[in-house]
Amino acid sequence: MIDKDGNTLSFVEEHRIRRTLRTIRSRVRRLIVRAALDALEDGVGSVNLVAPGDVYEELFSFIGAGTLFTEMQYGFVRPVSIDDFEEVEALIVRGQTEGHLLPRTPEQIAQILPSCWGYRIGDEHLAGICSLLTEPYRRDRAGEITAMYTLTRFQGEGVAAVLVREILKEARARRLKYLFACTSDDLVAALFSRLGFERARASDVPAAKWRGYDPSRIASLSILRAHLG
């Protein structure tokens, strides 16, 4: 399924299916969507709608091609477990390859895995991840949101926003003074701003953040900070 702008809808909850039915002109397409809704009403947990030629991409790639129909909000955020490490590492490497994440060595990735959180689609795969890094900043009682990445097929579905909101809750529960994030992506910076983060200077975050950091790169970063007091 696609939205009014021609973008694929990765997942659609039941209440949105009913609205969608009213806008579909094709009788065949309306019948297909109606069948998915009927299945949900009959107790099926979820229905995946995908074109026959896209089945392989849907099942065996990170990109995906179909639309997942669910009765209610299907994703949830939780800290990753050791059983998730391999999947999380694969997403971080993918994000680095695509240029969305700062390059890290395998050893550096291994160090942040225990601090990662994931947005999981039901009992299936991870749609997005991020890390709440606190150990380097414990003296400052601060935390950094880093290694945030959302799979291409779920971008625009609010996954990153849900992750950040959950991290904010966790940070408050840990009585951190503030959270910060650094990004060179204007869209990511805008997301943090919408969620209450404010623009900051390099000196407004722990000095430990910049140890070994390329000084020339700092100037290109948007540094955002959320006070939690």
Where are these regions (language model features)?
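C-terminal catalytic "cap/lid" subdomain
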Residues: 1-111, 156
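Short acidic/polar active-site loop segments enriched in Thr and Asp
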Residues: 45, 177, 198
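A conserved beta-strand-loop-helix scaffold within acyl/acetyltransferase catalytic domains
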Residues: 103-150
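Conserved acetyl-CoA-binding loop-helix of GNAT-fold acetyltransferases
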Residues: 150, 156-169
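Conserved GNAT acetyl-CoA-binding A-motif
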Residues: 171-184
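Conserved active-site alpha-helix within GNAT-family acetyltransferase domains
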Residues: 185-213
